[in-house]
Amino acid sequence: MLKVYIETMGCAMNSRDSEHLLSELSKLDYKETNDPKIADLILINTCSVREKPERKLFSEIGQFAKIKKPNAKIGVCGCTASHMGADILKKSPSVSFVLGARNVSKISQVIHKEKAVEVAIDYDESSYAFEFFEKKAEVRSLLNISIGCDKKCTYCIVPHTRGKEISIPMDLILKEAEKLANNGTKELMLLGQNVNNYGVRFSSEHAKVNFSDLLDKLSEIPGIERIRFTSPHPLHMNDEFLERFAKNPKVCKSIHMPLQSGSSAVLKMMRRGYNKEWFLNRVEKLKALVPEVGISTDIIVGFPNESDKDFEDTMEVLEKVCFDTLYSFIYSPRPFTEAGAWKERVPLEVSSLRLERLQNRHKEILEEKARLEVGKTHVVLVENRHEVDGQIVGFEGRSDTGKFIEVTCKEKRNPGELVEVEIISHVKGRLMATTKNNQ
């Protein structure tokens, strides 16, 4: 039995790709290990959305090269592999092969070649997306429904690393979802770069279907209790989508709405396809349909030419929406993007101050929202149990609206159970609860 160690960086799509890599390698008698020192194969599944993870890659390669077995191979996979290709081999001689994000199913071929590079982004591996393999039962499972991206946001490298957007045929998705349900999955996380644009283009001729249709079909699968998805695009959140999202009882009432900027001028420079008013209108419509909805977002500060007024527009949207989760970053220039070639730059010290102000205000908002949760009840999907000296003391999980809740109780609750809990306190935005009968 050979051993493989996988270091996964970045988004949920990368996590699913790592599962796919394990699926392919299991056919070659590889088994996953958590110790790179004993691995016969070390894979680094990379992210390139920002510069920092790329810099980390070469540090990781150096560390693994020092501790690996003499004959162990190191492979670099994912988005950084897609856009750097053979340059990775030049910079790091200890790397044996490079495998792009659109070429995951070729892993069994490249591990037998020395200095192989497979990074074509026009390779259609949608038919390989669901190589199901036996694994321990998971309460929450990742499920690809599309690959690639057709959007041309001026700051984003993803279209260059993952290629054109292709929707995976619905029959394949439903078949995989049924297998996951039979393996113990209670909650699906659907994945795609523009997940709610599903159905626009398939790899071959298929019946016309949209994202809401897919959600309805997945909801009919016995055993699946909850469905989440990431990452949707605000541009595709039309009235029909929002109304069907609200009506489907199995679709969790939490949604990611990546704002990126609250300034219409900056959004135009980013080529996002919507403006501030459109975004706020979508939020207003959504909250009218689902008042308790949980909304998360992405925000970039310090985008080229972002003025003080532009940043204040972002702060205004933050105040109006009161996002439940905020992923915020200083703009990072990326190769192969339009904005990456622009000479105008917001000084780092200005961007840093803006980010600090944004994040500090969001922390205050979370405290305010957490305080209002005390006394409310939620149904939580149990994810992990807490034990002390062999005694059950509680569990943790997420509510339908995406709130992460730590629960104290004496009775045994198994992962996958749905349990009604009452919020009793909060600490720095974290919610604490007990079961309704306080057992």
Curated annotation (Swiss-Prot):
Which EC class does it fall in? transferase
By its UniProt entry, which InterPro entries does this protein fall under? Elp3/MiaA/NifB-like_rSAM, Methylthiotransferase, Methylthiotransferase_CS, Methylthiotransferase_N, Methylthiotransferase_N_sf, MiaB_methiolase, rSAM, rSAM_horseshoe
* Cofactor(s) of this protein: [4Fe-4S] cluster
Where on this chain does [4Fe-4S] cluster 1 bind?
Answer: C11, C47, C79
Alphabetical UniProt keywords:
4Fe-4S, Cytoplasm, Iron, Iron-sulfur, Metal-binding, S-adenosyl-L-methionine, Transferase, tRNA processing
Q: What does the record say about how the cofactor binds?
A: Binds 2 [4Fe-4S] clusters. One cluster is coordinated with 3 cysteines and an exchangeable S-adenosyl-L-methionine.
- What name goes with this protein? tRNA-2-methylthio-N(6)-dimethylallyladenosine synthase
> What gene is behind this protein?
miaB
